[in-house]
């Protein structure tokens, strides 16, 4: 790269609290740990998104282009916190002063504090204009977001749903960790997340819990797909463990999705049963964590952690949860966190149902099963590529029963020429889990959590 071009990589986190809480964090935490700021400057953005940074003795103008904007979740073991972070890669290109527009779009005054190698930026936004300002106030933010999505343009400074006037100055707190290479050091990332947890803990007594659209939230919790299914041969001492990173028993229950929030947990199963309880969230940060689960009799087993949704603050609508900005949890992070919860928490009483538990994952090799206290029908395997596979002794499919013809149907049509073997009364239009052999279809159980039959390969 030339002298006028700079590639910058950083991990970023924004503290999303009201103004009074941000100043509380500044006075009671940041200033006590770092009495003197490391740097002060003022950023001016023109109409072309060129940033001019003015310090006490210099002024430099650059145009920042976003090359990478990736959301991820880091698990902080010390406090069992799932910290939602953003990894950014930007290209900064120097701009001559005579090419900077005279029209100022934003003016931000920033004070930078250095804590454990992390830049803690306390910002005062004196002016901020954007595409939303030209529309009616109640719908402006949504219209601007829609235009951005339709045009396919990523904004380096995304519009915020805020109102600034002559008597309003918006405060913001941002944490940034700059790094070089493929990824930041694990110790640096842990120290970064420790700062996040310690700062946000100062707001715990405010019990921030905005209203949530639970149906939309659970619909957003998409379970991971199985990339393959492998049959286990009968009589083998243990299945082949080649390429296995972690494994767990495949529970034979009703699948569901749920969400943890502080003081409350909600579960919806695939057969449209709802379970809710006022229980404490096991995680260190006040966020929404979605999960996949399996309901077996009177027990709910959390089998996977899927996403983190953050609460956000603006001075128009106060606190809200943006369900369009999910932070995905990697499969290996979810497995490590579940193992920690299995050992540290064990079971949580669930009033009116039974209890909530966390599934345990094991290191290879896969162990043969002789006796278990809960029904299982195989293994769940996480391979070295962090893809899920299921190992079963008897691969099954979901088929729909058609009473007039007396046949079972896949999604492609009736399966003819095979004997239907069933120990239960079959109902027209119901979906059943079945095992197909050369000459017969063995009906194992009814699947009220399935609406349509599956494909038979």
Curated annotation (Swiss-Prot):
Entries under InterPro entries matching the protein? LEF-4
User: Catalytic residues per the record?
Assistant: 250 (n6-gmp-lysine intermediate)
Recorded catalytic reaction(s): these are: a 5'-end diphospho-ribonucleoside in mRNA + GTP + H(+) = a 5'-end (5'-triphosphoguanosine)-ribonucleoside in mRNA + diphosphate; a 5'-end triphospho-ribonucleoside in mRNA + H2O = a 5'-end diphospho-ribonucleoside in mRNA + phosphate + H(+)
Query: What biological processes does GO assign it?
Result: regulation of DNA-templated transcription
Which Pfam family name is an example for this entry?
LEF-4
Could you tell me the keywords of this UniProt record? GTP-binding, Host cytoplasm, Host nucleus, Hydrolase, mRNA capping, mRNA processing, Nucleotide-binding, Nucleotidyltransferase, Transcription, Transcription regulation, Transferase
Q: Which family does it belong to?
A: Belongs to the baculoviridae LEF-4 family.
Summary of the function given for this chain in its UniProt record: Component of the viral DNA-dependent RNA polymerase that catalyzes two reactions involved in viral RNA cap formation: an RNA 5'-triphosphatase that hydrolyzes the gamma phosphate of triphosphate-terminated RNA and a guanylyltransferase that reacts with GTP to form a covalent protein-guanylate adduct. Therefore plays an essential role in late and very late gene expression.
Q: What's the protein called, per UniProt?
A: mRNA capping enzyme LEF-4
Q: Which organism is it from?
A: Orgyia pseudotsugata multicapsid polyhedrosis virus
Taxon lineage: Viruses, Viruses incertae sedis, Naldaviricetes, Lefavirales, Baculoviridae
């Amino acid at each position: 790269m030339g002298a006028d071009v700079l590639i910058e990589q950083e991990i970023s986190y924004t503290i999303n609290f009201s103004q009074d809480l941000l100043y509380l964090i500044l006075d009671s935490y940041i200033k006590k740990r770092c009495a003197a700021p490391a740097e002060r400057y003022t950023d001016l953005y023109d109409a072309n998104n060129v940033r001019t940074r003015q310090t006490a003795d210099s002024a430099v103008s650059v145009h920042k282009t976003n090359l990478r904007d990736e959301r991820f979740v880091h698990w902080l073991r010390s406090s069992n916190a799932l910290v939602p972070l953003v990894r950014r890669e930007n290209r900064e290109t120097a701009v001559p002063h005579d090419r900077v527009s005279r029209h100022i779009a934003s003016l931000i005054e920033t004070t930078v504090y250095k804590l454990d190698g992390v830049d803690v930026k306390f910002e005062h936004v004196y002016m901020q204009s954007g595409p939303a300002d030209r529309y009616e106030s109640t719908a402006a933010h949504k219209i601007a977001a829609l235009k951005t999505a339709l045009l396919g343009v990523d904004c380096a400074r995304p519009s915020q749903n805020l109102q600034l006037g002559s008597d309003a100055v918006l405060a913001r707190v941002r944490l940034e960790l700059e790094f070089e290479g493929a990824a930041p050091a694990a110790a640096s990332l842990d120290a970064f997340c420790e700062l996040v947890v310690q700062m946000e803990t100062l707001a715990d007594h405010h019990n921030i819990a905005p209203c949530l659209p639970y149906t939309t939230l659970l619909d957003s919790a998409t379970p991971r797909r199985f990339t393959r299914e492998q049959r286990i041969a009968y009589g083998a001492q243990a299945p082949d463990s080649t390429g296995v990173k972690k494994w767990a028993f495949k529970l034979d229950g009703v699948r569901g999705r749920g969400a943890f929030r502080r003081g409350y947990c909600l579960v919806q199963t695939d057969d449209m049963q709802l379970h809710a309880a006022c229980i404490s969230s096991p995680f260190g940060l006040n966020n929404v964590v979605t999960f996949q689960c399996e309901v077996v009799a009177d027990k709910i087993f959390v089998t996977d952690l899927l996403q983190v949704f953050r609460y956000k603050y603006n001075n128009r609508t106060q606190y809200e949860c943006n369900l369009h900005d999910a932070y995905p949890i990697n499969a290996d992070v979810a497995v490590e966190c579940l193992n920690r919860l299995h050992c540290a928490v064990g079971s949580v009483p669930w009033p009116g149902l039974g209890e909530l538990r966390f599934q345990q994952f094991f290191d290879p090799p896969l162990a043969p099963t002789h006796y278990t206290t809960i029904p299982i029908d195989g293994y769940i395997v996480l391979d070295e590529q962090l893809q899920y596979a299921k190992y079963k002794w008897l691969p099954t499919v979901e088929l729909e029963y058609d009473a007039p013809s007396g046949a079972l149907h896949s999604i492609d049509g009736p399966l003819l020429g095979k004997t239907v073997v069933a120990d239960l009364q079959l109902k027209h239009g119901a979906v059943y889990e079945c095992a197909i052999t050369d000459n017969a279809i063995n009906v194992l159980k009814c699947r009220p959590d399935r609406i349509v039959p599956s494909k038979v390969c």
